[in-house]
Amino acid sequence: MPATTTTFDAVLKDWFLGKVRDTLNEKVTMFEIANAKAERVGGRRLVYPVHVGRNFGVGTRAERGTLPTAQNEVYVTATVSPKYWYGRIEVSAQAMKQSQGDRAAFAEAMSEEMDRMTRNSRKYFNRMLYFGSRGDLCTVASDQSSVNTTTVNVTSSTVNVGSPLRFIQAGMILDGLNASGAATDTSTVSTDFTSSTVASATVGASGSSTITFSATTTVVSGTIMTLTGCGYNDFNGIDDGIDSSGTYQGVSRAAYQNKSWRANILGNSGTNRPLTLNLLQQAWDAASEASGEDDTTTHLISHYSVRREYLDLLTPDVRFTAQTLKGGHKVLDFNGAQFRFEVDAPFNTVYGINAPSWHLYKISDFEWADEDGSVLSRVSNIDSFEGFMRMFGNFGTDAPNKNFRITDIQATL
């Protein structure tokens, strides 16, 4: 019998090809824009006055007429409460010891976990800075009956129109927020389930999506899924700031005198329509008119699917030019403002933002907790070590009227 790879298998070696390969999208456009306007703050909460109304004690009169009644300027107080983000790792002593050195492993376990957590924190924040404080990942579909089950039909949340599983992966621990009522913060929210672990997530052939939990879970139609403990604890996002209703930073947008606290929203009642240059210009002009600044929009941001729609508008006349960013990257523009695209952005939506009006308030920047002099701590009764990252602060705009959001844009995912 001739020698073959089968008979010689015990002698053959594996040839290892260097470092760990990255396959995850690490682009964090919104985080980079926000972090460029970061501010160090402190105290119980952030407070600043906002001028929302003029003194209208003016008018013309006849000779010797009674002077206008004295009025006053109108101010409101905006408040920003801090939020607290954490990222935690744990590595066994065996994994640490057995991964030391290039000959033992592709990467040392503790260094790899700490480095990946640092990157993951940026990616987590990037998603959060779009979708905001409620922490939506997806919702239970309308055809899901209210039962104890392990397999749950899901659909996109109202702020995550499109693929409902793009922020879900196996191993996540989720809470289900009750969709009924008018919850606006942690004190008013109720849950349909808590701390359920995702075993798998599947997109079916028909486009239906399911999440399979590791144990039976009580679900109802419309339940909003978030990472456990994160409901209304996430940092505020641009969807919170670029809105025209509700209360933002303690100021009611419903009050007529506070209309300058409303952002510019161009929707189509939930029906998608083609993107046009005229639609973009309408939104641009709305923000310019509301703010009194012709070039108030500094960036437009959208999902990659909308980039294709935008390029289709420009290609027939070859009217697009690309700006060059640091590192040589090229970006499109509209009216001279950068038009940026990334995977975490909501589908079917274009944001127009005034970057100087947005602030990433930092009480504590991203850091590994080491008040006791060590980043790592022993886990009680186990030969294992753990550490955690943290960042305290919040995110928001002090001029919502300088920003716009176009929704219901037709785009192929």
Regions found by a protein language model. Name each.
Residues 1-59, 67, 71-413:
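Core alpha/beta structural scaffold of self-assembling particle/tube/pore-forming proteins
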